[in-house]
């Protein structure tokens, strides 16, 4: 764009760019230099000489000016003549400028030439040409021939490209070319100069008259023209902008009518600017001799202004009032930007920033400045020309300077975006709504914008946006790329692509980049509409409902919900430089608003679902919704792109209804993301980690109502409804945790809440994890519980409300950080997860029946488990578990449901209990299982196998296996929420599947084996982090089968079934592909001891008691554990992992080592992968061991204490770091992400002090792969061998097998104890 010569010129050198250019530049520049003294106006590149020469050239050339305006002053100027002479190539320039105008490439060169010529001959060309060009631009505008206008139009197009030199040079060149077109007979350069001199001195200098009106005379101009030229350049900068604007006839557009209204604005500013800032007196005093560069600067920046002003000025001499108007704008722009600071940068540099965006700026500028562009973009121009002049010139310049506004077919959109001068007008998406949405009325406008967005259309955008959109786009400089895309989808996509906005931390942060785009991409119209809505809600954090809507929905669809869709389209970002979107996402009133709006959103979502939108979509959205404020923040911070990734999956999975739902959900969700990024309000909320809890509370509120109604709706009044809806409701119940709230919202959330949380893995992991835990238990309660324990589900909602609410609060805190950093990967995983969830949702309908058996404990446990499942599923889903189990957190409900369903045939009650317990806690499931013992366990095992295998083989069993996998996944989720989480979860799922596959072997063991999976599953379900091992143990047989299945589905090497005899080290090495020190795996022994303690404790508790203890540990700690588990998962997910996971994990790690060791041993210890699971499973295992050990009292207390501590620590850490600073938060998120991933890997080692980092990684990997393979193989073998023992352990002889399991589990817990890692 800028040649060396341009740079030299900009720096004051007069490069001989062309033979003519050097000639003119030289002659002009030299004249500037040598004529500078002569004119005494060397300020302007020999400006005086320029004035004199230009006076002559203009007089002679101007005489021939076709344009009377330029001819009227007939500014023949020797200099201009000289310029023409020196620019004899300038004749080429003029001629070629025509070509250059016609061809942007030439324009670039010509622009450079002009820039150089102007800068070189700035004295003559700069002031005179600027004036000339201004006058000529104006004269051309109203008096130039159409071809000249077209040339100007061409210049406009080309200037858009080479806005920098192109714009102001084009202005000069446009004048020259226009004059050339007019006065082709005349010397091209001189003609342009002359005509310009005539008209421009007359008009422009009249406009600048205070300084140069008398000087407009050729001699008067000589002296004053240098000054006016100095002004002129500044004015011309803007004038140039309009001239080249996409209006071939910028100068020739509505010559007088638009110019007087619009151009006069720049003209007057040019006048005033020229007088005030650019005027010979001002610029001269300002810049003195440096005026040369200021001339360049004027040429570059003021050039656009001056171009505008000049065109306006030249055209409407009597439009001085407008000039007066524009001067403030232009002057504000010019003085700040065109003055020494702006001038300091060479005009070349200066101009391009303006000019590059100027194509858009030009668009708005002409819009403002003149209708010349009105012809081009009449709708935009008028509006833009109206608003832009007043505040947009600065924004305009910003547009110019900010080529950020994409030079896409929709300049109006870019203008508003680029015009960030307004500030927080986050209208990055669509011009229409941008136009509708003003800073003053973002909520209504965003609402309207949503409507308008629905009816988005470049024309509409152009027409509506110009005034508002321009400014709002100015406010959101990043927005340009978003709004630039004419298509809504593309706009949204562009906004998602403008994830830099998030990165910029600008309002656009969350707006388009994060979720809007994905959703928009989801459904162009919906996305755009949603984008508008999100902006509306986010744009004005003060608007609670839109915000809460946005918070609930934005989040649902904005970050996480849009993770897949947005990721695809945006990855954008999110990209996903989702650095700070999430800060904005949480709305202050979100908790309150979320309660209502969330309910409303839930209602809407439910309505959408009811409308036939996939429940998965709604669930996804809801889970995103739940996660919206906190997790969305976090993901906006770190995982916007991940969310987008998830969103595309979500969009893919729920594209049918998701896209249908997306508009609503998006518009509901978008505000949140907008809030996250849109206000830099996001910055307001970014600090508000409380909003994380807020959001979780909001989620609680929204999901709570949703959950209860879901129970009521799904379960009818009772939670007995079902399946997907019940699960969804349960999810929301988990989120809501409030009997009252749950009931109201559930109907709406039925199809969407559970699905939404299920889907939004990130949220599921964090806030949604709790929600899903609650939902899982709610769903479990709902399905079977509806029959046996409908109330408990409600009770669960209520009793767990306190626990879960606390958890939710902390989870919210956690959610923010946890979801933020870790959720980048988690979001990505969730994209996959959601897809799987979508698949699973087919089977997940009845996933919550089984949970209901243990609604009371399911309350807590299901919450925990549900959350774990959710996290696991979400984590696992991304892991690539094609199994439906991962597909949806609902799957975890489906898991319990599947089990419930599977057991249902045999023991509808028992299995729901046993499955529910297995899923939620052994309390009920264990007693049932142990009471039902063989049958339940057997059937459960069968059903586990069936469910897992079916899940593996048949959708329903797959659904069921998915929950198991999901439960296994929570270990990973907790342990390794990051990149490894996919594999980890997948490995966990696969390992679980492998275990499950071996479960048939265990099934051969009869009830014990089956019971163990049942117990394990409940433990896994209950202890998201801890149960995974149990889950795996439970799922060993199925794990094997499913391992193959998942291998098929996920093509994971890790899925390869591992020989049961394969040693942990071998498995770890095989999975990790690296040598794993046995010592790193040795924590197994240590864990064995630890586990033995809890296991005897569990044994002492008695099979049912131990299991029930585990259940109670989960049930009791459910609140804590939900908190802890949720926290643990959150922590694991990343945010809590490093800060929270450490503090709470340490105490829990001990218990986890004891308690966790056993369950982990069951499922995880056999495999190093399991160890990493242990990293996540340690918590689970800890819970499990709590359960197992009769640490029901100790464990729950400790767990309660730990969760409290964890929550406190989390809150402190989450509240503290996020509140510290967004950047700090973002850094922290990234740090946490890295640390979480590393800790997920290293937490294995950190968990067991003896475990080395390589083992951490190995265990992490082994936990991923081995979790899949080892779990399938060694755990399989171990469980195959010990499952009966473990089953007995569960059934009554948990000590030995559990000890065995504990050995492995303990080492696993130690090796992978996230708390230890976190503590580290």
UniProtKB/Swiss-Prot annotation:
Regions annotated as coiled coil: none
Compositionally biased residues, Basic and acidic residues: 108-119, 308-329, 1292-1303
GO cellular component assignments: adherens junction; cell junction; cell-cell junction; perinuclear region of cytoplasm; ruffle membrane
Residues bearing PTM Phosphoserine: 486, 851, 1027, 1033, 1245, 1248
Regions of compositional bias (Polar residues) in chain numbering: 58-71, 95-107, 369-378, 454-465, 741-782, 865-877
Top-level taxon of origin: Eukaryota
Location of the region described as Disordered in the Swiss-Prot/TrEMBL record: 1-124, 183-202, 209-233, 252-426, 452-492, 676-720, 741-802, 835-942, 1085-1116, 1153-1174, 1275-1320
Biased composition (Pro residues): 255-267, 338-356, 404-415
Location in the cell: Cell junction, Adherens junction
Keyword presence, Phosphoprotein: yes
Biased composition (Acidic residues): 849-859
Claim: Glycoprotein is one of the keywords in the record: no
Record-level GO BP terms: cell adhesion; positive regulation of blood vessel endothelial cell proliferation involved in sprouting angiogenesis; positive regulation of cell migration involved in sprouting angiogenesis; positive regulation of MAPK cascade; positive regulation of sprouting angiogenesis; positive regulation of vascular endothelial growth factor signaling pathway
Keywords: Cell adhesion, Cell junction, Phosphoprotein
Residues the record lists as Phosphothreonine modifications: 484
Protein name (Swiss-Prot/TrEMBL): Junctional cadherin 5-associated protein
Source species: Mus musculus (Mouse)
């Amino acid at each position: 764009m800028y040649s060396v010569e341009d740079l030299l010129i900009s720096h004051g050198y007069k490069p001989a760019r062309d033979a003519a250019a050097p000639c003119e530049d030289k002659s002009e520049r030299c004249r500037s230099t040598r004529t500078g003294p002569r004119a005494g106006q060397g300020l302007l590149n020999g400006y005086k000489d320029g004035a004199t020469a230009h006076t002559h050239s203009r007089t002679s050339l101007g005489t021939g000016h076709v344009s009377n305006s330029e001819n009227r002053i007939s500014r023949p100027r020797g200099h201009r003549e000289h310029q023409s002479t020196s620019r004899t190539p300038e004749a080429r320039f003029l001629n070629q400028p025509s070509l250059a105008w016609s061809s942007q490439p030439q324009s670039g060169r010509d622009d450079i030439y002009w820039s150089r010529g102007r800068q070189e001959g700035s004295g003559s060309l700069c002031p005179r040409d600027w004036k000339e060009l201004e006058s000529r631009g104006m004269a051309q505008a109203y008096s130039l021939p159409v071809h000249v206008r077209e040339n100007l139009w061409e210049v406009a197009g080309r200037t858009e490209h080479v806005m920098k030199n192109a714009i102001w040079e084009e202005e000069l060149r446009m004048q020259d070319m226009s004059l050339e077109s007019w006065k082709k007979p005349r010397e091209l350069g001189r003609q342009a100069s002359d005509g310009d001199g005539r008209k421009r001195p007359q008009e422009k200098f009249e406009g600048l008259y205070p300084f140069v009106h008398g000087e407009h005379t050729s001699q008067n101009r000589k002296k004053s023209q240098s000054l006016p030229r100095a002004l002129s350049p500044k004015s011309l900068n803007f004038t140039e902008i309009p001239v080249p604007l996409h209006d071939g006839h910028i100068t020739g557009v509505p010559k007088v009518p638009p110019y007087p209204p619009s151009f006069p604005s720049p003209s007057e500013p040019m006048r005033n600017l020229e007088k005030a800032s650019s005027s010979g007196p001002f610029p001269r005093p300002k810049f003195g001799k440096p005026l040369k560069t200021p001339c360049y600067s004027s040429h570059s920046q003021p050039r656009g202004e001056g171009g505008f002003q000049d065109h306006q000025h030249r055209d409407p001499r009597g439009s001085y009032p407008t000039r007066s108007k524009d001067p403030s704008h232009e002057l504000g722009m010019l003085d700040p930007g065109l003055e020494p600071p702006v001038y300091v940068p060479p005009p070349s540099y200066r101009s391009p920033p303006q000019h590059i965006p100027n194509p858009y700026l030009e668009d708005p500028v002409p819009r403002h400045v003149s209708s010349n562009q009105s012809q081009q973009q009449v709708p935009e121009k008028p509006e833009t020309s109206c608003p832009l002049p007043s505040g947009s010139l600065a924004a305009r310049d910003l547009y110019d300077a900010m080529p950020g506004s994409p030079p896409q077919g929709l300049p109006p959109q870019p203008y508003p975006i680029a015009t960030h001068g307004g500030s927080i007008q986050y209208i990055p998406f669509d011009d229409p709504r941008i136009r509708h949405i003003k800073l003053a009325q973002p909520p209504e406008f965003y609402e309207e914008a949503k409507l308008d967005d629905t009816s988005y259309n470049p024309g509409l955008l152009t027409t509506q946006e110009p005034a508002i959109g321009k400014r709002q786009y100015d406010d959101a400089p990043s927005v340009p790329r978003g709004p630039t895309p004419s298509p809504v989808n593309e706009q949204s996509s562009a906004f998602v692509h403008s994830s830099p906005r998030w990165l910029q931390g600008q309002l656009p942060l969350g707006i388009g980049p994060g979720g809007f785009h994905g959703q928009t991409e989801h459904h162009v119209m919906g996305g755009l509409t949603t984008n508008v809505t999100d902006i509306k809600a986010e744009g004005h954090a003060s608007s609670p409902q839109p915000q809460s809507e946005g918070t609930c929905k934005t989040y649902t669809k904005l970050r996480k919900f849009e993770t897949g869709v947005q990721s695809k389209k945006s990855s954008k970002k999110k990209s996903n430089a989702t650095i700070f979107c999430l800060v904005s996402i949480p709305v202050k009133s979100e908790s309150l608003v979320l309660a209502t709006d969330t309910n409303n959103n839930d209602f809407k979502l439910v309505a959408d679902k009811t409308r036939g939108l996939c429940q998965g979509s709604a669930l996804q959205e809801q889970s995103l919704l739940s996660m919206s404020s906190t997790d969305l923040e976090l993901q906006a911070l770190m995982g916007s792109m991940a969310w987008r990734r998830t969103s595309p999956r979500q969009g893919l999975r729920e594209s049918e209804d998701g896209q249908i739902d997306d508009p609503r959900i998006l518009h509901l969700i978008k505000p949140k993301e907008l809030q996250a990024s849109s206000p830099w309000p996001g910055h307001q909320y970014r600090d508000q980690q409380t909003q994380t809890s807020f959001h979780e509370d909001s989620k609680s509120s929204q999901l709570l109502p949703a959950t209860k109604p879901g129970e009521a709706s799904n379960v009818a009044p009772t939670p007995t409804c079902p399946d997907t809806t019940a699960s969804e409701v349960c999810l929301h119940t988990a989120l809501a945790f409030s009997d009252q709230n749950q009931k109201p919202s559930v109907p709406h959330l039925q199809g969407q809440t559970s699905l939404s949380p299920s889907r939004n893995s990130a949220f599921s992991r964090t806030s949604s994890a709790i929600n899903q835990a609650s939902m899982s238990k709610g769903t479990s309660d709902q399905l079977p519980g509806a029959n046996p324990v409908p109330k408990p589900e409600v009770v669960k909602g209520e009793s767990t409300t306190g626990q879960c609410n606390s958890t939710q609060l902390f989870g919210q805190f956690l959610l923010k950080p946890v979801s933020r950093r870790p959720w980048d990967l988690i979001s990505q995983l969730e994209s996959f997860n959601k897809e799987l969830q979508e698949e699973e949702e087919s089977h997940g309908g009845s996933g919550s029946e089984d949970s209901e058996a243990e609604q009371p404990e399911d309350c807590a446990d299901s919450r925990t488990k549900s959350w774990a499942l959710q996290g696991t599923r979400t984590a696992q889903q991304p892991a690539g578990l094609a199994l439906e189990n991962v597909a949806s957190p609902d799957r975890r409900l489906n898991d319990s449901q599947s089990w419930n369903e599977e057991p249902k045939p045999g023991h509808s009650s028992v299995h729901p209990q046993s499955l529910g317990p297995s899923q939620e806690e052994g309390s009920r499931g264990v007693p049932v299982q142990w009471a039902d013992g063989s049958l339940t366990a057997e059937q459960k095992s069968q059903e586990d196998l069936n469910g897992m295998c079916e899940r593996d083989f048949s959708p329903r069993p797959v659904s069921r296996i998915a929950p198991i996998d999901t439960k296994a996944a929570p270990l990973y989720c907790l342990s390794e929420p990051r990149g490894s989480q996919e594999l980890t979860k997948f490995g966990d799922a696969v390992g679980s599947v492998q275990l499950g596959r071996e479960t048939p072997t265990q099934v051969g063991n009869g009830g014990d084996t089956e019971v163990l999976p049942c117990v394990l599953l409940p433990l896994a379900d209950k202890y998201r982090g801890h149960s995974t091992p149990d889950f795996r143990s439970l799922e060993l047989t199925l794990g094997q089968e499913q391992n193959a299945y998942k291998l098929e589905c996920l093509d994971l090497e890790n899925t390869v079934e591992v020989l049961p005899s394969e040693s942990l080290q071998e498995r770890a090495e095989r999975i990790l592909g690296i040598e794993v020190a046995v010592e790193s795996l040795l924590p197994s022994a240590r864990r064995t001891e630890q586990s033995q303690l809890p296991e005897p404790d569990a044994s002492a508790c008695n099979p049912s008691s131990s299991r029930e203890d585990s259940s109670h540990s989960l049930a009791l700690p459910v609140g804590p554990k939900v908190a802890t588990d949720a926290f643990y998962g959150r922590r694991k997910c990343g945010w809590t992992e490093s800060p929270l996971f450490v503090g709470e994990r340490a105490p829990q790690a001990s218990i986890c080592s004891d308690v966790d060791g056993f369950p982990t041993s069951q499922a995880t210890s056999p495999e190093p992968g399991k160890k990493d699971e242990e990293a996540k499973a340690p918590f689970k295992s800890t819970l499990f061991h709590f359960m197992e050990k009769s640490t029901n009292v100790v464990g729950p207390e400790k767990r309660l204490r730990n969760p409290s501590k964890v929550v406190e620590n989390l809150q402190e850490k989450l509240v503290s770091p996020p509140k510290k600073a967004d950047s700090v938060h973002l850094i922290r998120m990234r740090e946490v992400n890295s640390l979480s991933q590393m800790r997920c890997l290293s937490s294995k080692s950190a968990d067991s002090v003896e475990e080395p980092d390589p083992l951490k990684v190995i265990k992490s990997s082994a936990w991923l792969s081995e979790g899949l393979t080892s779990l399938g193989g060694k755990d399989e073998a171990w469980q195959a061998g010990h499952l009966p023992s473990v089953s007995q352990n569960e059934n009554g002889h948990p000590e030995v097998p559990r000890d065995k399991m504990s050995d492995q589990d303990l080492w696993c817990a130690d090796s992978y104890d996230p708390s230890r890692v976190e503590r580290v």
